[in-house]
UniProtKB/Swiss-Prot annotation:
Promotes protein synthesis. May act as a fidelity factor of the translation reaction, by catalyzing a one-codon backward translocation of tRNAs on improperly translocated ribosomes. The keyword GTP-binding applies. Disulfide bonds: none annotated. The gene is lepA. It holds the Pfam family LepA_C. This is Translation factor GUF1 homolog, organellar chromatophore. Belongs to the TRAFAC class translation factor GTPase superfamily. Classic translation factor GTPase family. LepA subfamily. GO terms for biological process: positive regulation of translation; translation. NCBIfam families: lepA, small_GTP. The lineage of its organism: Eukaryota, Sar, Rhizaria, Cercozoa, Imbricatea.
Amino acid sequence: MTDAPLSRIRNFCIIAHIDHGKSTLADRLLQDTGTVAARDMQEQFLDNMELERERGITIKLQAARMEHIANDGEAYILNLIDTPGHVDFSYEVSRSLQACEGALLVVDASQGVEAQTLANVYLALEQNLEIIPVLNKIDLPGADPERVRQEIEAIIGLDTSKAITCSAKTGIGISEILQAIVERIPPPVDAIEEPLKALIFDSYYDPYRGVIVYFRVMSGQIKTRDKILLMASKKNYELDEVGIMIPGERKVDSLHAGEVGYLAASIKSVADARVGDTITLANNPANNALPGYTEVKPVVFCGLFPTDADQYPDLREALARLQLSDAALKYEPETSSAMGFGFRCGFLGLLHMEIVQERLEREYDLDLIVTAPSVVYKVNMIDESTVMVDNPATLPGPQKRKSIEEPYVKLEIYTPNSYNGTLMELCQERRGEFIDMKYLTTDRVTLHYELPLAEVVTDFFDQMKSRTKGYASMEYNLIGYRPNDLVCLDILINNEKADPLTTIVHRDKAYNVAKGLVEKLKELIPRQQFKIPLQASIGSRVIASESISAIRKDVLAKCYGGDISRKKKLLQKQAKGKKRMKAMGKVDVPQEAFMAVLTLNK
């Protein structure tokens, strides 16, 4: 590996919406610069989780260092910092942007600009990055690069006269992209003489070396055996090794300002090396940390229970291990009369929740029951205190609380013009407040709504996709709490409260949700030998009920004719047995019933 001066280092990332070809483009850049030999190449090289390749999305950040001989004959070092494209991981995106001086904006030439592209572009513009527009997938028959150019100019306001057209799949335009990175992205600022400041943009847990931290040196230099201080967690460590990612790690003696690398220092948990934290030297610390570090707060909560109670310790260990590499995951033990022991977990969003659930089932071989997701409510109590509630079953009683506030989001939907009617209908059904509507081009519209997060986390995304045949895309940001007329809806199965089915709903919707829920449960819960009443109640008032009729054994089958009193005796005996059974009997509720809350189109 050559050691290049600062003027020949370029740090850049790739911004794109899901499926616009970002990972494929990264593959081509690695191949074209000879960083990865053709025989080692596999698709989505930087997506190293099996789940990432399967879903075709980037979850964890990756980094790679490439060498490129430019047209002027000099060898340049290009550090690619890969970013996730999904809205749930927007904090990770903002940190990786901070570690760069430029960004490739990849837009699918057949699809045009989408919601997440925009959100990330605005983050990049805030960091003053040099943005190079790249129109990908021009080999597709439906590609229309000219229309997409106009869209980028109209929506984002970027000059697209120098936009590069390419096809990452076939390799067209890759050398132009490499040349543009060298020519148009500025080199890092020379700050080698200043005290060490390095930004952590990712970390993962290695069972042998502890946490491996990926960082970008902003000023000063860092060497093996240095004693470092992490400014947010205030922890001190001695460095065991420092190195660069090629992809694959290679040790070096030191890294200076402008370079990207990794370090290992026997750090025990990812929580100690938080993403966005600043690394400095313990004996010569920097005066202030790099800006932009925030604690990531979970937004969506749900209960995870093992189907087999014996797996509870395994689930606890699996969550502890996952948390080592995923600092955004929060969990605490919870118990439920219907489900036994489990955990209440907090996630950044629905995709994050699905990914954690899949990783638990795949990597740790667990069989899980997941309760419906809920958001964090703010309850104002009569004694002037406030309580944050993430589990509807723990909501304080109506006599103790004054009001309930729920989180609201600002929602942006990008859609072809022909679908805006059905989307406006969907947002109104979900208690949305219309803000404005803008025409981006003659046939593309952006809708702005403010609506409760609780209405978004269930099946809003699926509904939006199915109503627009997959053409619409959305992006949301939290905008704070607002009071609403909310009530707690309890579900009673055989006169026993089923905690996992408890939901918090708006009073106007309570009856419809309750009715839909008990009808759904009636379909899903298997019949028993006795009658099962299903009730939905607000406090002590039942507002909807259904009952599952009993399976009846024909006890008179053996009586041919004979005296009526004999038949009565048998029927009374059966009725007595059923009565006892009803008092003692326990109803097993299948997993589908707990997800009924989710699939109910509120």
